[in-house]
C-alpha cells in the first residue's frame, strides 16, 4: 500500500515522546495504526508489550483480526529469525492487551485487588436490568431513611413532593452517573456548588469571568452584528435612508452597553438599561415596492432579532439587582449542598450493597483500577509492562479514562488516535476537551507531537468537497472544538475512482404550504420518505456505482444504500412507505420496547393486570391479533355508554346484535380471564410465552416488513422478562410500571441486532453508522430541531461549569431559575450545538460516492431568510451567534452554502457548479413529489362523476378475455415455505389463500386447557420444530455441545415444560459432533444464522404455466451459512418424519427451497460462490448434500 507522507510519519513513530494523530474521516487511521504496530514488531518488539485501547469490543476484535492478517502476511514475506519472531507474535496475539479500557481495568483488578482490599470473589454486574433494580432498591432505602430530616424535606420540596419523589431520585441518579466518570467523584460533586459561593459579589470571581460576562457579551454582540448588517443593507435603499440614523443610534446604544459591561459593575449595567431606551423607529420616504420587499424580508427581521437579543439581557439577567441575586444564590447554596450530600449518601450505600453482594459494575472497574494505580509501586510495575500505550477514538474518552491511561503510560510513550470532529458521545460522558487541550498544546510544540491525517480515501471528491464547503463556514474552536481549515479539511485522495464519474450532492426540500388544501395525513415526514423512496427506485437497476473491490462499475443494488436518521422515531413510517414501493429494508437497532409489535404485547399485559383501561384494551382489539375495525369498536361502545370500554365489552358479549362479533368477544373474555389466572400463579415470562403460543403473534409479525427484526424484538421482551424473574422481580403490575419508567432508555433497551449485509436498504442512526461507510447515503429529516432538553428541567449540570437549579421559595412556593442555571444552561446548549455539528460531520462523511439530503420547510421564503445571514459574508466562519441561532442541520447547511456564495437566495432551487463544487437543490410539494402525482391521478379517475353509460363499450369490456388470467391469480409476495408445493409440483398453482392484510383474526378462541381437562395434550410437531430451531439458533459453537449445555440452553429459552421435554437432545448432539458440525465450529467467526432475505424472481422461473417475466417478491429465512476460503456453505435444518426413502424425499421436497436460498446468497455476495447446500435431517440423522 502506498502511504502518504504523514501516514509514513505515524507508522515510523518511535515511542520516545507522546504522539497525537488527528485523523479525519476516511483517512485510514486503523490501517496506519496496525502498520505502526507491525513495524514495531519488525524492530524486535513483542505484541504483549503494547497496550491498545479501543472504544468497543467489536473494534478490539477487528483490531486483533487485522493485526493477525498483517502478521500472517509478514510471515510469508520474511525469513529466518524475523520470520520466527513473527510466528511467536501470532501465538501471543490472543493474550495481548488489546481491548476496551473496561477490560484492561478488570485485568488490573484481578492482579492487584488486594491493594485496595477488594474481595477477589466478585461477580461482574454486566446485566443493566439487574443494576437498575439494585439502584432502585438502594435509592428507595436511602430516601426512606431521610424522611425525618428537615434539610432533606426542604430539598424534596424544591424538586419533588412527599407523595412523588421520583424527580429527585432521577436527579441523584444523573449526578451519580456523571460522578462515576470522574477520577475523583466526591471532589467533582463538591466543586459543582462553587458558583453559588459569591462572597465577593456577582461580578467578581470565576463565575462572572468565565460564564456570566461572556454570555452577556454574546447577546450584546449578536445584537450589534445584526444592526450593522441592517445598517449596511439600508444604505442602498433610497426610500429607507432615514433608517441609517436610527440604526446608527441603535448601534451606539449597544456599543455603549458593551463598554459598561466590561466595567464589571452590576448596578451600572442595570442603570444603563433604565437610562437608555431603544431609539424610536424611522419611517420610509418612498413607495418603491422592490425596496419595500427587500426591507420587509431581510432588514426588518434583522432589526427585530437585534432588539430581542439586546432586551433578553435585561429580561434574563438584569431584572433583579445584585443583592437579590446574591440572596437567592445563598439560599440555593443550601439546596445544592443538600443535593450533593444526598448523592454522596446514595453512592456510599450503593457501594456497600455491591460489596455485600460481591458485585462490580463497569464504572467500579475503572474507578478501582484508578485507585490501584495511585499506589506508586503498582503504577511503576504496570508502566514497565508496556513499551507503548495506544488509544483509538481518543476524542471519546472521559476524565477517569484519561487519568488511567496517563498513569499507565510512562510520560513519553502515549500514542493517541482520534478525530475531534467525530466526538459524538457526550451522552455517555465523553469529554472532547482532553483531545482539544492536547491538540492545542502539541500544535504549539508543547508536550508532544501532532500529526494530522486529512487525506480521505473513502469518499469521491464530490462528497469531500461538499463536506468542506459546509464545515469551512460552520466549525471553529468556539463551536465544534477545532478550526476547520487547512490540514483539518478533507482532501479526496482515492485515485481509483474513475475520473469521468460525475456525482453531485443532492438536496431535496419539501415545501409545506400551510394555506393549501392538501390532506392533513400527507405530512412532512411522509413526504420526505416518499421523496427518498422515489429516488431509490430511480437509482436501483438504472444507475451504476464504482465497485472498490473489483475496480469496475456495476449496477447499483439496494444494499449499497443507507438511510441515516438522527433518532429512531421515523422507522415505522419508513417501513410502511417502503413496503408500498416494494423496497426491501433492514432497520438497525432501536428501542425494542417502543416498537409496534412489543407495544401490543405490553398493552395485552396491561389489560391482564387491569382490563378497565380503555387505551390498551382498544389497542389489543384493534391489533391484527383480533382485527376489529373502527365500526366494530364503535358498535361495542354502544352497549354501555356510561362506563368504561371494558364494561361495554362485557355487555356486548352478552347482548350484542352482531352474533359473530358477540361470539368473538365472549371468547376474548374467556381468554383474558385465563391469562389473569396464569398471571396470578406464574411468572411473567410464562404469561408472555403463553400469549405468544395462543395468538401466533411472533409468526404474524414475521410476515410484516422487517419481520426478522420484529421477531427478535418479541424474543428480546421474553428474555428481558426472564432476566427480571431471575432477579426475583415479581408481579405483573410492578413489571409494567418498571418498563414504563424505562421506556426512554434507548441505550439500555436496544433492539436485538440483525445482519446488515442483506440485500436491502439499511436504516440506522448516525451514531450507529460511525466508523462505517456506504456507497450511497441519504440523510433525512434535515429540519429536525436540535435537541436541547438537557439544558432545561429543574436541574442542569455540566462537568466544567457546575450545577444550575430552580429555587423554590419555602413559604410562597414561587419558583425562579437561579442566575447560575441560566448561565449553565446556555453553556450546555453551546456544547449540545457543538456535538450536533460533529454529528452532521459524521453523517456526511459516511458517503463514498453519492450524498442525498432531504428536509422540509413550512415556507421556502422562511427557509431562504434563515439561510441568508450576510453578517458573515467575507469572514472565515459564520458569526457565532448566527450558528447558535440555527435550529437544525438544514439551517446550518443552507446558511453555510449561502455565505460561501455557492447558492443564490432569490431562487435557491437549481443546479450549482462553482469553485469545483457541484450540487443541486430541488423543492417539492404535495403535487410534485414523484409517485404521489400518479397515485392522486388514479384516485381522481376513480372518483370521476358519472355522466352516462356507453353500453357497447361496457359489453366489450365485460366480454374481454384477459390473456394473463393465470398471472393475475398469483400473489406478488411469497414466503419460501409457501413455494414448497410448487417445487414439488411445478404445474401446481394451488397456493395457500392469503388475506390481503394477513391478519390472524381470532373468530373463536380455543377452549382453555383447564376447562377441557386434557392434561395429556401432546406438543405439536410445529411447536417441537420451532423449539428445536430456536435452540439450534442459540447454540454457541465455540463451546462444548453436550447434554448439560443443551439442557441449560433449553431452560433459558423454552419456558414450557412439555415443549422442553419434546426436544430430542441426542439428534442435536449428533449434528454438533458430525463432520459437518466440526466444519461449522471451525468457521464460527463467519457463521450467520436465521438470516432473512427478500428478492425478486421472474414468475416463469417458479411456475411452468406462466409466460410473464413479471417479478414475484420472495421472502425467506436461511437457517444458516458460513464462509470459508471465499466459498459459501448454506444449510437448513429439517425435522420431518418420512420413514421410507427418507433421503430422497428430503431432496425432492427441499432442493428448490435451498436453490432459492443459494440464489439469495449469490445476490448478497456477488463476488463469492455458493459451493454447498446441505439439508440437516435431524430425524434420520442424515446430512444430505444437494
Curated annotation (Swiss-Prot):
Encoding gene, per UniProt annotation: addA
Instruction: Please provide the record's keywords in A-Z order.
Output: ATP-binding, DNA damage, DNA repair, DNA-binding, Exonuclease, Helicase, Hydrolase, Isomerase, Nuclease, Nucleotide-binding
Q: Which cofactor does it need?
A: Mg(2+)
User: One GO molecular-function annotation for this sequence?
Assistant: ATP binding
Q: From the Swiss-Prot or TrEMBL record, give the protein name.
A: ATP-dependent helicase/nuclease subunit A
Q: Which protein family is named in the record?
A: Belongs to the helicase family. AddA subfamily.
Show the taxonomic lineage. Bacteria, Bacillati, Bacillota, Bacilli, Lactobacillales
Question: What would be one Pfam family of this protein?
Answer: PDDEXK_1
Name the InterPro entries for this protein.
AddA (IPR014152), DNA_helicase_UvrD-like_C (IPR014017), DNA_helicase_UvrD/REP (IPR000212), P-loop_NTPase (IPR027417), PDDEXK-like_dom_sf (IPR011604), PDDEXK_AddAB-type (IPR038726), Restrct_endonuc-II-like (IPR011335), UvrD-like_ATP-bd (IPR014016)
Amino acid at each position: 500500500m502506498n502511504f502518504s507522507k504523514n501516514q509514513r510519519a505515524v507508522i515510523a513513530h518511535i515511542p520516545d515522546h507522546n504522539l497525537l494523530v488527528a485523523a479525519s474521516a476516511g483517512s485510514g487511521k486503523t490501517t496506519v495504526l496496525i502498520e505502526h504496530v507491525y513495524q514495531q514488531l519488525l524492530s524486535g518488539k513483542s505484541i504483549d508489550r503494547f497496550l491498545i485501547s479501543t472504544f468497543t469490543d467489536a473494534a478490539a476484535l477487528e483490531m486483533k483480526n487485522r493485526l493477525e492478517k498483517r502478521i500472517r502476511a509478514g510471515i510469508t514475506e520474511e525469513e529466518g529469525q524475523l520470520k520466527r519472531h513473527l510466528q511467536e507474535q501470532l501465538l501471543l496475539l490472543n493474550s495481548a492487551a488489546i481491548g476496551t479500557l473496561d477490560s484492561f481495568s478488570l485485568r488490573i483488578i484481578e492482579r492487584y485487588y488486594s491493594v485496595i482490599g477488594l474481595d477477589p470473589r466478585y461477580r461482574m454486574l454486566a446485566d443493566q436490568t439487574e443494576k437498575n433494580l439494585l439502584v432502585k432498591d438502594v435509592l428507595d432505602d436511602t430516601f426512606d431513611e431521610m424522611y425525618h430530616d428537615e434539610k432533606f424535606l426542604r430539598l424534596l420540596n424544591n424538586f419533588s413532593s412527599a407523595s412523588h419523589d421520583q424527580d429527585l431520585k432521577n436527579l441523584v441518579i444523573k449526578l451519580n452517573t456523571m460522578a462515576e466518570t470522574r477520577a475523583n467523584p466526591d471532589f467533582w460533586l463538591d466543586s459543582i456548588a462553587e458558583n453559588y459561593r459569591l462572597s465577593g459579589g456577582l461580578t467578581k470571581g470565576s463565575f462572572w469571568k468565565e460564564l456570566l460576562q461572556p454570555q452577556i457579551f454574546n447577546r450584546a454582540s449578536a445584537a450589534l452584528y445584526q444592526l450593522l448588517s441592517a445598517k449596511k443593507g439600508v444604505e442602498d435603499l433610497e426610500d429607507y435612508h432615514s433608517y441609517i440614523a436610527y440604526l446608527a443610534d441603535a448601534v451606539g446604544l449597544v456599543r455603549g452597553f458593551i463598554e459598561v459591561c466590561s466595567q464589571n459593575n452590576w448596578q451600572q449595567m442595570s442603570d444603563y438599561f433604565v437610562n437608555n431606551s431603544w431609539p424610536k423607529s424611522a419611517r420610509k420616504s418612498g413607495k418603491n415596492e422592490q425596496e419595500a420587499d427587500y426591507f420587509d424580508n431581510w432588514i426588518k427581521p434583522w432589526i427585530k432579532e437585534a432588539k430581542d437579543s439586546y432586551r433578553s439581557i435585561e429580561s434574563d439577567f438584569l431584572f433583579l439587582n445584585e443583592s437579590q441575586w446574591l440572596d437567592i444564590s445563598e439560599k440555593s447554596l443550601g439546596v445544592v449542598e443538600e443535593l450533593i450530600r444526598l448523592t454522596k449518601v446514595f453512592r456510599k450505600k450503593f457501594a456497600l450493597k455491591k460489596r455485600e453482594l460481591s458485585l462490580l459494575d463497569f464504572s467500579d472497574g475503572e474507578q478501582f483500577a484508578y485507585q490501584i494505580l495511585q499506589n506508586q509501586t503498582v503504577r511503576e510495575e504496570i508502566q514497565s509492562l508496556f513499551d507503548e500505550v495506544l488509544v483509538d477514538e481518543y476524542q471519546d474518552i472521559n476524565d477517569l479514562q484519561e487519568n488511567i491511561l496517563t498513569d499507565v503510560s510512562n510520560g513519553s510513550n502515549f500514542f493517541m488516535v482520534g478525530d475531534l470532529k467525530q466526538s459524538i458521545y457526550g451522552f455517555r460522558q465523553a469529554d472532547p476537551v482532553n483531545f482539544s487541550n492536547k491538540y492545542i498544546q502539541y500544535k504549539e510544540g508543547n508536550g508532544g507531537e501532532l500529526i494530522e491525517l486529512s487525506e480521505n480515501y473513502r469518499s469521491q471528491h464530490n462528497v469531500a468537497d461538499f463536506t468542506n464547503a459546509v464545515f469551512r463556514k460552520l466549525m471553529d474552536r468556539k463551536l465544534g472544538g477545532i478550526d476547520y481549515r487547512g490540514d483539518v479539511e478533507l482532501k479526496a485522495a482515492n485515485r481509483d475512482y474513475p475520473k469521468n464519474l460525475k456525482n453531485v450532492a443532492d438536496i431535496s426540500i419539501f415545501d409545506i404550504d400551510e394555506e393549501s388544501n392538501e390532506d392533513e395525513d400527507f405530512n412532512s415526514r411522509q413526504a420526505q420518505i416518499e421523496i427518498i423512496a422515489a429516488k431509490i427506485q430511480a437509482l436501483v437497476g438504472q444507475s451504476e456505482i464504482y465497485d472498490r473491490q473489483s475496480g469496475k462499475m456495476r449496477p447499483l443494488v439496494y444494499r449499497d444504500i443507507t438511510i441515516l436518521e438522527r433518532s429512531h422515531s421515523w422507522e415505522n413510517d419508513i417501513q410502511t412507505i417502503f413496503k408500498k414501493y416494494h423496497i426491501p429494508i433492514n432497520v438497525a437497532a432501536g428501542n425494542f420496547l417502543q416498537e409496534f409489535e412489543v407495544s401490543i404485547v405490553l398493552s395485552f399485559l396491561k389489560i391482564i393486570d387491569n382490563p378497565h383501561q380503555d387505551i390498551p384494551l382498544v389497542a389489543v382489539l384493534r391489533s391484527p391479533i383480533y382485527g376489529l375495525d373502527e365500526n366494530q369498536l364503535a358498535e361495542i361502545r354502544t352497549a354501555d355508554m356510561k362506563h368504561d370500554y371494558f364494561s361495554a365489552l362485557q355487555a356486548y358479549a352478552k347482548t350484542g346484535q352482531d352474533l359473530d362479533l358477540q361470539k368473538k368477544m365472549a371468547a376474548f373474555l374467556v381468554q383474558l380471564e385465563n391469562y389473569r389466572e396464569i398471571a396470578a400463579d406464574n411468572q411473567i415470562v410464562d404469561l408472555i410465552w403463553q400469549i405468544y403460543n395462543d395468538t401466533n403473534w411472533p409468526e404474524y409479525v414475521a410476515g410484516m416488513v422487517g419481520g426478522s427484526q420484529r421477531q427478535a424484538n418479541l424474543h428480546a421482551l421474553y428474555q428481558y422478562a426472564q432476566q427480571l424473574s431471575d432477579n426475583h422481580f415479581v408481579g405483573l403490575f410492578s413489571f409494567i410500571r418498571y418498563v414504563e419508567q424505562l421506556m426512554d432508555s434507548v441505550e439500555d433497551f436496544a433492539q436485538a441486532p440483525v445482519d446488515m449485509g442483506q440485500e436491502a436498504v439499511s436504516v440506522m442512526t448516525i451514531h450507529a453508522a460511525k466508523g462505517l461507510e456506504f456507497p450511497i447515503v441519504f440523510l433525512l429529516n434535515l429540519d429536525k430541531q436540535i435537541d436541547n432538553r438537557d439544558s432545561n428541567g429543574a436541574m442542569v449540570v455540566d462537568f466544567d461549569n457546575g450545577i444550575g437549579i430552580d429555587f423554590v421559595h419555602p413559604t410562597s412556593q414561587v419558583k425562579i431559575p437561579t442566575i447560575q442555571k441560566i448561565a449553565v444552561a446556555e453553556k450546555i446548549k453551546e456544547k449540545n450545538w457543538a456535538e450536533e455539528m460533529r454529528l452532521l460531520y459524521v453523517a456526511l462523511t459516511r458517503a463514498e460516492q453519492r450524498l442525498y439530503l432531504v428536509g422540509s420547510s413550512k415556507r421556502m421564503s422562511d427557509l431562504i431568510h434563515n439561510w441568508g445571514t450576510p453578517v458573515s459574508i467575507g469572514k472565515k466562519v459564520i458569526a457565532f451567534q448566527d450558528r447558535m441561532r440555527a435550529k437544525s442541520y438544514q439551517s446550518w447547511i443552507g446558511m453555510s452554502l449561502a455565505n460561501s456564495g455557492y447558492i443564490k437566495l432569490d431562487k435557491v432551487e437549481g443546479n450549482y457548479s462553482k469553485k469545483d463544487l457541484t450540487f443541486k437543490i430541488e423543492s417539492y410539494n404535495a403535487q410534485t413529489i414523484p409517485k404521489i402525482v400518479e397515485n392522486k391521478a388514479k384516485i381522481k379517475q376513480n372518483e370521476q362523476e358519472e355522466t352516462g353509460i356507453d353500453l357497447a363499450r361496457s359489453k366489450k369490456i365485460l366480454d374481454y378475455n384477459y390473456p394473463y388470467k393465470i398471472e393475475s391469480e398469483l400473489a406478488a409476495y411469497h414466503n419460501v415455505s409457501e413455494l414448497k408445493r410448487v417445487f414439488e409440483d411445478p404445474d401446481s398453482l394451488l397456493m395457500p389463500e392469503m388475506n390481503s392484510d394477513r391478519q390472524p383474526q381470532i373468530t373463536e378462541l380455543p377452549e382453555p386447557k383447564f376447562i377441557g381437562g386434557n392434561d395429556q395434550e401432546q406438543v405439536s410437531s410445529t411447536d417441537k420444530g420451532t423449539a428445536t430451531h430456536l435452540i439450534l439458533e442459540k447454540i454457541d459453537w465455540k463451546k462444548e455441545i453436550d447434554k448439560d449445555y443443551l439442557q441449560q440452553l433449553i431452560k433459558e429459552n423454552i419456558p414450557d415444560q412439555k415443549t422442553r421435554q419434546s426436544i430430542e437432545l441426542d439428534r442435536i448432539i449428533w449434528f454438533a459432533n458430525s463432520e459437518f458440525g466440526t466444519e461449522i465450529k471451525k468457521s464460527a467467526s463467519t457463521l450467520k444464522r436465521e438470516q432473512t432475505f427478500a428478492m425478486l424472481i421472474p414468475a416463469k422461473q417458479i411456475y411452468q404455466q406462466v409466460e410473464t417475466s413479471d417479478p414475484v417478491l420472495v421472502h425467506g429465512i436461511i437457517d444458516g451459512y458460513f464462509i470459508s476460503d471465499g466459498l459459501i456453505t448454506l444449510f437448513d435444518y429439517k425435522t420431518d418424519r418420512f420413514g421410507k426413502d427418507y433421503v430422497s424425499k428430503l431432496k425432492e421436497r427441499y432442493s428448490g427451497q435451498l436453490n432459492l436460498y443459494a440464489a439469495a446468497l449469490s445476490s448478497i455476495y456477488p463476488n463469492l460462490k455458493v459451493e454447498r447446500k446441505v439439508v440437516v435431517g435431524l430425524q434420520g440423522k442424515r446430512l444430505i448434500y444437494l
